[in-house]
């Protein structure tokens, strides 16, 4: 088992023939992802990377039976792309793009929720079930099929947690980057719920960052609902208030959203927190009693 995606998930790409869409689709195909086609308006009827190109998502879904779509489209057009996928019959939308206007995302998220469509992102690395399916921009080779579910607001910090769990021999069930924007399509709680219900996931790593209250809300959810061991790291311990730290959502405002507040909430929920990213693998081993693979 895994969450969201597996080896049978049929995936299309919106923005398929663009440079980003082309590069990352090639990587996904090489990884073994079941890519079945792509969408670029005006190029329908042609082929690209040996796969059919369609003018619309609806046509692509009807012809291929696609269930998931990954979006590599410039920010001003992302809202339309997300809505087209949602109304076109796609059940899982993964939007990688950064810089989408907040009001656009608000609208897109509400529509996806109404339609029962799962949206991951934007401004995220995507989703991967190691050895089976890769939807997004993460490096496939650092992943190992295994038993740790990873959910994160940061892309590169996810890769660090992945590398440590791979090196330790624990591996990952599924890794989900929820993105660093103020309005994510799916939040920590949405993904924690899936990991809690997934029999393959035996432990969870949650990587948060300063800004907003997503981690505090996740802590309350963990305290009430999650029985699996959880290790967490919060980025931005030394961040000054009022300064945006990379992501649009990573800002301490009105004295709220500091790393210390988040660490405290998580510790209160029984989560094992680490102050250094380098300690994630070690903390997992301590919490679970798993044996670390010798290098």
From Swiss-Prot:
Pathway: Carbohydrate metabolism; tricarboxylic acid cycle; succinate from succinyl-CoA (ligase route): step 1/1
Enzyme Commission no: 6.2.1.5
Positions annotated to bind CoA: 17-20, 43, 96-98
Example of a GO MF term: succinate-CoA ligase (ADP-forming) activity
Annotated GO CC locations: succinate-CoA ligase complex; succinate-CoA ligase complex (ADP-forming)
Alphabetical UniProt keywords: Ligase, Nucleotide-binding, Tricarboxylic acid cycle
Keyword Aminoacyl-tRNA synthetase in annotation: no
Enzyme class name: ligase
SUPFAM superfamilies reported in the protein's UniProt record: NAD(P)-binding Rossmann-fold domains, Succinyl-CoA synthetase domains
Keyword match Ligase: yes
Gene Ontology process terms (BP): nucleoside triphosphate biosynthetic process; tricarboxylic acid cycle
Catalytic activity from the UniProt record: succinate + ATP + CoA = succinyl-CoA + ADP + phosphate; GTP + succinate + CoA = succinyl-CoA + GDP + phosphate
Residue positions of the active site: 247 (tele-phosphohistidine intermediate)
Alphabetical list of Gene3D superfamilies matching this protein: NAD(P)-binding Rossmann-like Domain, Succinyl-CoA synthetase domains
Superkingdom per UniProt: Bacteria
Residues binding substrate: 159
Subunit structure comment from the entry: Heterotetramer of two alpha and two beta subunits.
Record function comment: Succinyl-CoA synthetase functions in the citric acid cycle (TCA), coupling the hydrolysis of succinyl-CoA to the synthesis of either ATP or GTP and thus represents the only step of substrate-level phosphorylation in the TCA. The alpha subunit of the enzyme binds the substrates coenzyme A and phosphate, while succinate binding and nucleotide specificity is provided by the beta subunit. Can also generate UTP or CTP, although it preferentially synthesizes ATP and/or GTP.
NCBIfam families: PRK05678.1 (NF004230), sucCoAalpha (TIGR01019)
Family per similarity comment: Belongs to the succinate/malate CoA ligase alpha subunit family.
Protein name, as recorded: Succinate--CoA ligase [ADP-forming] subunit alpha
């Amino acid at each position: 088992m895994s969450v969201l995606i597996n080896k049978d998930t049929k995936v299309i790409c919106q923005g398929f023939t663009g440079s980003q869409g082309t590069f990352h689709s090639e990587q996904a195909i090489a990884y073994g992802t079941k890519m079945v086609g792509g969408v670029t308006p005006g190029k329908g009827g042609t082929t690209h990377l040996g796969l059919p190109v369609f003018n619309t998502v609806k046509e692509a879904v009807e012809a291929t039976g696609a269930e998931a779509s990954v979006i590599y489209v410039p920010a001003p057009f992302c809202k339309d792309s997300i809505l087209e996928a949602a109304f076109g019959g796609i059940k899982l939308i993964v939007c990688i793009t950064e810089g989408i206007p907040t009001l656009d995302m608000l609208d897109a998220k509400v529509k996806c929720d109404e339609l029962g469509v799962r949206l991951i992102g934007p401004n995220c690395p995507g989703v991967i079930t190691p050895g089976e399916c890769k939807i997004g921009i993460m490096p496939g080779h650092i992943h190992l099929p295994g038993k740790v579910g990873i959910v994160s607001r940061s892309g590169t910090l996810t890769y660090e947690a992945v590398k440590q769990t791979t090196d330790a021999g624990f591996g990952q069930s599924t890794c989900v980057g929820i993105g660093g924007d103020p309005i994510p399509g799916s939040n920590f709680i949405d993904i924690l719920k899936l990991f809690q219900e997934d029999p393959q996931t035996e432990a969870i790593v949650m990587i948060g960052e300063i800004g907003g209250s997503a981690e505090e809300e996740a802590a309350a959810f963990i305290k009430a609902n999650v029985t699996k061991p959880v290790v967490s790291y919060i980025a931005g311990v030394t961040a000054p208030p009022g300064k945006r730290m990379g992501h649009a959502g990573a800002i301490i405002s009105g004295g709220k959203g500091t790393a210390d507040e988040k660490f405290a909430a998580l510790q209160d929920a029984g989560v094992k927190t680490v102050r250094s990213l380098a300690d994630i693998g070690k903390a997992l081993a301590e919490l679970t009693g798993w044996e670390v693979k010798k290098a």
